[in-house]
Amino acid sequence: MLHWSLVFLVFALIAAVLGFGGLAGAAVGIAKILFFVFLVIWLVAFLMGRRAI
């Protein structure tokens, strides 16, 4: 799934250069969603991996 987030990130960067519209705009939206999903997953994994003192 991380692979797909990188693919959509590349599409989003290309869309930013060429202008946001059509399929490019959709790729930007998907890239934003995947970014926040992975951010939440990382935060949960980080907090669950810590040991209680």
Swiss-Prot record:
**Keyword field:** Cell membrane, Membrane, Transmembrane, Transmembrane helix
Protein localization? Cell membrane
Q: Which GO terms describe its cellular component?
A: plasma membrane
- One Pfam family name from the record? DUF1328
TM ranges are 6-26, 28-48
Q: Name the predominant localization.
A: membrane
Write down the membrane topology: Multi-pass membrane protein
Question: What is the similarity comment for this entry?
Answer: Belongs to the UPF0391 family.
Q: Which HAMAP family match?
A: UPF0391 (MF_01361)
Name the record gives this protein: UPF0391 membrane protein Acid_3618
